[in-house]
């Protein structure tokens, strides 16, 4: 427990330095420790808390703040249009990208097993952390500080022209489509790996299989890029066979 206390002290010092960049001066250490504690870390260290409760609160706060922002910023858009915008802003892939850009991964408290499986790269965990930290800020410093922080981070990022074209998460879209009414298993398989090309880069070819049937194929210089392109290809093909609307 002494190690955890020392680690938490150093972590809080680093967090204070991070938030100071945004003119945010955090106070209550425990809120932020809880917001950063994954259940795998809590299990290993016999802690009574994880970030899940904070994530629950942060999710609600974020939905409210983004709804208010969109309502005030786009008076000419109808309910359906602003709902669609909100879903794009608060979706997992968008929040995860923001956390990557802010370099919050080193602050995460993960168990050894989760570290081994690169939990600090998983979209779900990164998105959860943004929401849980929003809750910590709300409990520590209040609504006005949270609103300003969201505007200076999330809103600023998504306001860049063409942002959503760059960040679109086709893998998540495909998974959500299947979960909505298709019980078949989705798998990504590496079928080809090129010899090192210019700059020692390797080109990977991945296929997306649904229920053992190949639906999509993609090539990229990383596994992640190839999987995203395979998912995009699969979504386009599914759009021709179902009522799914593929938004290009």
From Swiss-Prot:
Keyword DNA damage included in the entry's annotation: no
GO CC annotations on file: cytoplasm
UniProt keyword list: Cytoplasm, Endonuclease, Hydrolase, Magnesium, Metal-binding, mRNA processing, Nuclease, RNA-binding, rRNA processing, rRNA-binding, tRNA processing
Any GO MF annotation of the entry: metal ion binding
Top-rank taxon: Bacteria
Protein name: Ribonuclease 3
Catalytic residue positions: 59, 131
Name of the encoding gene: rnc
InterPro entries hit by this protein: dsRBD_dom (IPR014720), RNase_III (IPR011907), RNase_III_dom (IPR000999), RNase_III_sf (IPR036389)
Gene3D superfamilies documented for this protein: 3.30.160.20, Ribonuclease III domain (1.10.1520.10)
Function of the molecule: Digests double-stranded RNA. Involved in the processing of primary rRNA transcript to yield the immediate precursors to the large and small rRNAs (23S and 16S). Processes some mRNAs, and tRNAs when they are encoded in the rRNA operon. Processes pre-crRNA and tracrRNA of type II CRISPR loci if present in the organism.
First-level EC class: hydrolase
Domain DRBM: 169-240
Coiled coil: none
Pfam families: dsrm, Ribonucleas_3_3
Domain RNase III: 15-142
Cellular localization per UniProt: Cytoplasm
Lineage: Bacteria, Bacillati, Mycoplasmatota, Mollicutes, Entomoplasmatales
Species this protein is from: Spiroplasma citri
GO terms under biological process: mRNA processing; regulation of gene expression; rRNA processing; tRNA processing
Cofactor requirements of the protein: Mg(2+)
UniProt EC number: 3.1.26.3
Quaternary structure (record): Homodimer.
Family note: Belongs to the ribonuclease III family.
Catalytic activity of the protein: Endonucleolytic cleavage to 5'-phosphomonoester
Annotated positions binding Mg(2+): 55, 128, 131
């Amino acid at each position: 427990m002494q190690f955890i206390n020392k680690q938490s002290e150093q972590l809080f010092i680093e967090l204070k330095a991070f938030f100071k960049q945004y003119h945010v001066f955090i106070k209550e250490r425990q809120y932020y420790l809880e917001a950063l504690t994954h259940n795998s870390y809590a299990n290993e260290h016999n802690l009574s808390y994880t970030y899940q409760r904070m994530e629950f609160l942060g999710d609600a706060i974020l939905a409210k703040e983004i709804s208010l922002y969109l309502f005030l910023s786009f008076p000419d858009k109808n309910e359906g249009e602003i709902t669609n915008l909100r879903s794009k802003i608060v979706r997992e892939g968008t929040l995860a990208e923001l956390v990557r850009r802010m370099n919050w991964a080193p602050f995460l408290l993960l168990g050894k097993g989760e570290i081994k499986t690169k939990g600090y790269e998983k979209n779900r965990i990164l998105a959860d952390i943004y929401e849980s930290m929003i809750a910590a800020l709300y409990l520590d410093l209040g609504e006005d500080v949270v609103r300003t922080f969201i505007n200076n981070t999330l809103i600023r990022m998504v306001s860049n022209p063409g942002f959503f074209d760059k960040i679109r998460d086709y893998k998540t879209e495909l998974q959500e489509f299947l979960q909505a009414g298709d019980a078949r298993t989705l798998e990504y398989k590496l079928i080809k790996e090129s010899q090192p090309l210019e700059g020692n880069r390797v080109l990977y070819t991945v296929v997306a299989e649904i229920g053992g049937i190949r639906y999509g194929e993609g090539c990229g210089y990383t596994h992640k890029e190839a999987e995203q392109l395979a998912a995009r290809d699969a979504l386009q093909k599914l759009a021709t066979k179902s009522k799914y609307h593929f938004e290009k």
